[in-house]
Amino acid sequence: MTPADLATLIKQTAVEVLTSRDLDASMLPEQIVVERPRNPEHGDYATNVALQVAKKVGVTPRDLGTWLAEALAADDSIDSAEIAGPGFINIRLAAAAQGEIVAKILEQGEKFGTSDHLSHLDVNLEFVSANPTGPIHLGGTRWAAVGDSLGRVLEAAGAKVTREYYFNDHGRQIDRFALSLLAAAKGEPTPEDGYGGEYIREIAEAIVAKHPDALDRTPEETQELFRSEGVEMMFSHIRESLHEFGTDFDVYFHENSLFESGAVDRAVQKLKDNGNLYESDGAWWLRSTDFGDDKDRVVIKSDGDAAYIAGDIAYVQDKFERGHNLNIYMLGADHHGYIARLKAAAAALGYAPEGVEVLIGQMVNLLRDGTAVRMSKRAGTVVTLDDLVEAIGIDAARYSLIRSSVDSSLDIDLGLWESQSSDNPVYYVQYGHARLCSIARKAADLGVTYEDADLSLLTHDREGDLIRTLGEFPAVIRAAADLREPHRIARYAEELAGTFHRFYDSCQILPKADEEKAPIHAARLALAAATRQTLANALALVGVSAPEKM
């Protein structure tokens, strides 16, 4: 019985108790909260539902709690239910009910923890979206890991997810990129406000090798060649780096297409037609303050050119027109102003502003021996995705970026993540999975199986701790999806690995060489198998491998 199963039982029991006393069962909350008590001696789980409801139905919390506890204790899946304090109910599960969690995991396998909780959502998840003017830096690398994991978590909760990369190929930064490449090809210094680094020289040389006449064309033709070829080569490298990192996208959306297709003009005309765009001083302004923004925004400048926000507005409209009812933008720390701006754009276009969510990620710092690592071999002044992967590997890189909330800045200690010790979180979790696989191999050699295991034998305290931790996994996925916080999965994996290691140290799983096979061995092997499956499921959600040997 998982906490969710227990919550359902409590809800059903509470309805029966209230109805039998002519009390209003509609006062019960939609979701019954079930938690593990801080003191394990108080029971397996606790609920405060009596405190929540008693006053609403005109009885004391102690009375309602007593009635509920008596009714719950009569259920075969409950070993005991006791009233505590002003109206808390402490619950102990029967051994057979605890074992049901293990059986459910073994039956559901890779599906354990998933649900249809968010099946009503069609999500457009846009992340990374780095300009094609250089390799992905650490901030973009954080989004590559977190965004990919969030997509997996949302899908596990039942949502339909489209992963999207907004390819910024329209604007002055692309011109500066082209001029930087051209200068490198000519052997000239990097232009002011240009891009430097070894990668600029490499791309410039590749363009000249592909087009030997590149520098012999007219200035306009030469700049356009370096612009188009440079962007294509840079973005090809970005896509390859992301793919090797385990992050792929369903859609690569070109910003330029918004202008070439007329999408910007259509969005502007729609805003004019519905009165949410007005003219002042020769420019056209969005009435964004009517929709929660701190100021109105210029959409079409007085010279007739579109302001940057015009593309943002057209992009919002395009996403909704494609059928997405939740559009998540994952942006850097310098984009706080975009939250109100994008929601205002959606509302002005006639869409639900809650259909736009903006997640803001904070900075990432790389440290070695307490000193910041600031230089990249190829990129010059910034550390890149490739640098991080080269230093600590893909699994450690992804895990180090995912396990902390994006709301806070992140320091990555390279020495810690390189180490093969329990201090390294990803090593600790992966070692737990490898140890569980080793147990399975040894069990096969000994002829121990768990097909007919009596799971009611799992009564040791450490067994109970492990079973309860396993039972929390579905709720962890649900919370991670609802709150858009995939770091909860990584932290859960660490908790599960730690709980397993303590179980392993306290409970002999397999018979020793001179021992006969016993029912407890089969039961503990089943528990180990369920733990391995759940740990593998958690690692899959953060995009980290689950090694069978280490």
UniProtKB/Swiss-Prot annotation:
Keywords: Aminoacyl-tRNA synthetase, ATP-binding, Cytoplasm, Ligase, Nucleotide-binding, Protein biosynthesis
Primary location group: cytoplasm
Domain of life: Bacteria
Pfam families the UniProt entry points to: Arg_tRNA_synt_N, DALR_1, tRNA-synt_1d
Gene3D superfamilies assigned: Arginyl tRNA synthetase N-terminal domain, HUPs, Isoleucyl-tRNA Synthetase, Domain 1
Leader sequence residues: none
Family that this chain belongs to: Belongs to the class-I aminoacyl-tRNA synthetase family.
Descriptive protein name: Arginine--tRNA ligase
Organism: Corynebacterium efficiens (strain DSM 44549 / YS-314 / AJ 12310 / JCM 11189 / NBRC 100395)
